[in-house]
């Protein structure tokens, strides 16, 4: 029987690449969700015939409802953030893949876990903003949390030898360096969104591409790695690997290092999360070592790229510190993409929010959303 998948965020970059994998493996789509891209999800409905679809924007839901009216075999339509959580919690799928962008994915991640579903997680913000809540829920409900980020998938793959994993001493978390690698503050001052959206190696959505340019993405991934693999941040070293061939590595107590390599294609980690623990042929070409002329490794420049420094401060503060950093960044990136602030303002604002409070202590889901709201308000008040 074909594996059934609920795919949240199906019209984004990760979502469409996930459907490439689902198509190639002959999996069944149980549910799909999108925010507002009605035309795109209509095409997906016609090909994959999901039983349920959720549109989280009101306008998108109204447009999709009109398009599906009277259509034979149309999926049941759910709407809004509550509809997204309902879809994530529904009985039926074998795996829920959450590729929603931003903190909007947290509630759906928790709903899937609490309903007993294995969760393939591309929404790193679930762990960044609510890592304590997510890991606690995973332990309570005994489900698998399968990383989809290429770096965390690489680390996860390197740790499959459970005996060796007990001797883990360090994670080498790789970064591409983004489009502005090697530049200093003065060179970055006039960079536009068009400049920042030119990633050298990866095909990604706008928000994560900007995060790559500021190195915020690597800061978020550092926080994510702390929650996924149980190492303190000082045991996670960020290494710039410009070719995006070495996706990350782990170091053991005897100082041996195991790395995962492959072409820079997100369908590899997506497929591994969906087929785990099996490995099967897929749609990605093999890496030809004879064509690799150079693999370089460099230090990440935290002095210039302040988002990375801010994320390190945030995870060391603990509590809601990472949530505050994430909320500030989401708001700042939105303003940057609207041409309302400059590129360097993103790092300035994220760091200012992290420095504004101690953020320590336990927290609830309501606390997470309130912290996110306050961080965004802080950004808007300090432009």
Language-model-detected regions and their locations in the chain:
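Catalytic, metal-anchored helix/loop core of enzyme active sites in primary metabolism
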Residues: 1-383
């Amino acid at each position: 029987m074909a594996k059934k998948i609920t795919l949240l965020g199906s019209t984004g970059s990760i979502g469409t690449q996930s459907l490439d994998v689902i198509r190639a493996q002959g999996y069944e789509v149980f549910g799909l969700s999108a925010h507002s891209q009605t035309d795109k999800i209509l095409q997906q409905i016609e090909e994959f015939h999901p039983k349920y679809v959720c549109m989280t924007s009101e306008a998108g839901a109204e447009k999709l409802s009109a398009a599906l009216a009277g259509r034979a075999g149309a999926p049941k339509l759910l709407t809004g953030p509550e509809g997204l959580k309902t879809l994530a919690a529904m009985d039926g799928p074998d795996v829920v893949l959450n590729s929603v962008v931003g903190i909007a994915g947290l509630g759906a991640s928790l709903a899937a876990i609490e309903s007993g579903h294995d969760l393939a997680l591309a929404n790193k913000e679930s762990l960044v903003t609510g890592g304590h809540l997510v890991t606690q829920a995973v332990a309570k409900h005994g489900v698998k949390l399968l990383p989809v980020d290429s770096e965390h998938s690489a680390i996860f793959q390197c740790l499959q030898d459970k005996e060796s994993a007990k001797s883990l001493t360090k994670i080498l978390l790789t970064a591409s360096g983004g489009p502005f690698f090697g530049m200093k503050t003065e060179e970055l001052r006039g960079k536009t969104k068009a400049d920042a959206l030119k990633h050298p190696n990866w095909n990604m959505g706008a928000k994560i591409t900007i995060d790559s340019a500021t190195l915020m993405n690597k800061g978020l991934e550092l926080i994510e790695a702390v929650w996924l693999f149980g190492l303190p941040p000082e045991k996670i070293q960020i290494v710039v690997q410009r070719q995006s061939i070495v996706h990350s590595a782990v170091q053991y107590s005897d100082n041996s290092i195991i790395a995962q390599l492959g072409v820079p294609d997100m369908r590899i980690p997506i497929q591994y999360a969906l087929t785990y623990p099996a490995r099967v042929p897929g749609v990605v070409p093999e890496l030809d070592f004879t064509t690799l002329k150079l693999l370089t490794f460099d230090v990440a420049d935290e002095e210039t790229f302040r988002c990375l420094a801010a994320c390190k401060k945030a995870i060391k503060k603990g509590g809601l510190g990472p949530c505050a950093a994430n909320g500030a960044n989401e708001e700042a990136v939105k303003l940057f993409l609207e041409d309302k602030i400059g590129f360097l303002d993103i790092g300035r604002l994220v760091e200012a929010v992290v420095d504004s409070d101690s953020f320590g202590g336990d927290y609830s889901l309501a606390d997470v959303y309130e912290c996110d709201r306050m961080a965004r308000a802080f950004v808007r008040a300090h432009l």
